[in-house]
Amino acid sequence: MSKKNLFNDFSAVSTKEWKQKIQVDLKGADYNDTLVWESPEGIKVKPFYNTEDIASFVTNVATPEWKIGQAIFVQNEVASNKKAVDALKRGAEDLVFTIPTDTIKIDVLLKNINLKDIKVYFYFQFLASEYIAKIEELYKDNATNIHYNIDIVGNLASSGNWFHNLTKDHQELDKIATITNTQNTIGVNVSTYQNAGATMVQQLAYAMAHANEYLNHFKDTTIPNFTFTVSVSGNYFFEIAKLRALRLLWKSLQTEYNTTANCTILAVPSKRNKTLYDYNVNMLRTTTECMAASIGGADTICNLAYDAIYHKDNEFGERIARNQLLILKKESYLDVVTNPADGAYYIESITHQLAEKALELFKSIEATGGFLSNLKSHQIQKKIKESAAKEQELFNSEKEVLVGTNKYINKEDKIKEDLELYPFVKTNARKTLIIPIIEKRLAETVEQNRLKDE
């Protein structure tokens, strides 16, 4: 008995035919006004998509097998090592360490951690080539699994200053690239832009312009591998598309510079949409964001604990965050499907629209001197501030909803007595070379007013 393809019994339906049918169902209402909406990125989202929307392009971006990351701020290397080993036993697969000073002993921190199988991402709050040299000497046989995330441009953007100064920072960068044999040397912290209020097009364009500063610097030598740290927010399908667009844009830069330098994506949930009140909703938000990161093609996903903005690190919050990822991986099987977003017309369409718009903005940044020049003239800061203000107005007018904070509020909810960390923007009076890009949550003003009334 031969198998019959049931789809042969149905003729293809064109876009024109779909729109005609929808117009009938709308009974006179305007199609564009009723069903088409525009994203903050200027992308018009239609009520349906088909092959005609992706006829001219195919993404063709491979999705890696993603890993579960565990973030650890290292204040004491012995305690942090114990925490890391325990996290690995409980389901973590990669480790993400923030190193505050050069007094931290890396051999103690990484004791009993198998670097042949486990990726380690470092974020250094200082810049010292001698420190990197010690790590390379200790772990030269497994250096391919160490990501150093050296990001002097990102430090300038977020703090307003170089680690040392322009010349010395670049000298240290060159030394580190030589020491690490241009392995996973460079980091590009895109999270700063997202958490400060940049649109997705801006995030992608700034990521490319940011990376291009390093590519230009190393163009006459071997270009190191890059790690992009990307924050993922609640616009589910757009966030999937954003990560896919990032890989497309990186391929364009690879072609331009004739390099095979890798692009690793470390995805983390955004802090911008997280809230103090009705804080359990943060778990729902981060689950959606981690799922988007998985489908979008992140290499490592490091979840954010539901109480991270107001509680110190604690075992309960971190266990829940890790278990969210374990459920997505072990119970939902999101790690066994190759390129799960392939063939989704909507995602394919917005992937390419985001990439095209970001490429256009990237070119305009390069035409006006590049990323550093635009940081120094404060054009980047100005554009992010404008986008953040527009989003804030949407939140204030309840057009952008954060459940439990600006809509469906539980007035009996109290949080003041639970605050262990200061959850709002802190400003330190100090001299800076440029205006720093400041991260700020949408709910801060509302929460400050509610705290006064408790």
How would you label these PLM feature ranges?
Residues 42, 91, 250, 296, ...:
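Conserved, mostly hydrophobic/aromatic
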Residues 208-211, 229-321:
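Glycine-rich anion/phosphate-binding loop at the beta-strand->alpha-helix junction
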Residues 23, 85, 107, 136, ...:
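Predominant activation on well-ordered alpha-helical scaffold segments within soluble catalytic domains
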Residues 1-231, 235, 304, 435-453:
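Catalytic alpha/beta active-site cores
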Residues 184-212, 295-299, 304-338, 342, ...:
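Mobile "lid/hinge" segments at catalytic clefts and subdomain interfaces of large enzymes
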Residues 36-41, 151-153, 190-193, 225-233, ...:
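A glycine-rich phosphate-binding loop feature that marks nucleotide/adenosyl-phosphate handling sites
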Residues 199-203, 235-245, 272-284, 312-321, ...:
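Short glycine/threonine-rich loop-to-helix capping motif typified by GTGT followed
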Residues 319, 323, 329-454:
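Catalytic-core signal marking the mid-to-C-terminal active-site face
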